[in-house]
């Protein structure tokens, strides 16, 4: 695995795009190697987990509210919302909002426990929504989700190594 050193910079540093974190993440995401079968299976299970939790929260107020907001932004060839007819499409950012809210509402999806915790499954709704709208294939979706997991888990480990916790902030 490639190691990327991350540190804060002043806005005035005006880093070259190749030195910015977003660029480094894009390099990871665009890697041409095929993930191992165990990784592919894990991602498929995480997608099922996310969709299941979203359906379980389908009638809860936050999920209903986010879904209503998303439905106000229809888009031909857009993205789907968990639990609705797959012919109904909305702009990807709104599908990500509705699906992400539904997944997070019950907070039953995967958790990465280190010195702190995070939910790398939170990456799935936006990546899925963009992949749908862009017409990506299944392997592109899997690689996008793997990238989201890899980056989030490693950032959490890095933050935990310096005794930072979001739970203690005011």
Q: What are these model-predicted stretches?
A:
Residues 2-167:
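N-terminal core-entry segment
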């Amino acid at each position: 695995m490639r190691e990327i050193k991350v540190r804060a910079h002043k806005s005035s540093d005006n880093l070259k795009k190749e030195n910015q974190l977003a660029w480094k993440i894009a390099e990871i995401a665009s890697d041409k190697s095929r993930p191992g079968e165990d990784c592919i299976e894990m991602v498929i299970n995480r997608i099922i987990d996310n969709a299941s939790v979203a359906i379980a929260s389908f009638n809860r107020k936050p999920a209903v509210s986010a879904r209503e907001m998303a439905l106000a932004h229809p888009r031909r060839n857009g993205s789907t919302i968990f639990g609705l007819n797959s012919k109904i499409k909305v702009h990807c950012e709104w599908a990500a909002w509705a699906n992400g809210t539904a997944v997070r509402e019950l907070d039953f999806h995967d958790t990465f426990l280190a010195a702190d915790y995070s939910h790398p499954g939170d990456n799935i709704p936006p990546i899925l929504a963009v992949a749908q709208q862009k017409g990506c294939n299944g392997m592109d979706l899997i690689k996008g989700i793997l990238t989201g997991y890899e980056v989030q888990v490693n950032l959490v480990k890095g933050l935990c190594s310096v005794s930072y916790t979001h739970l203690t902030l005011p």
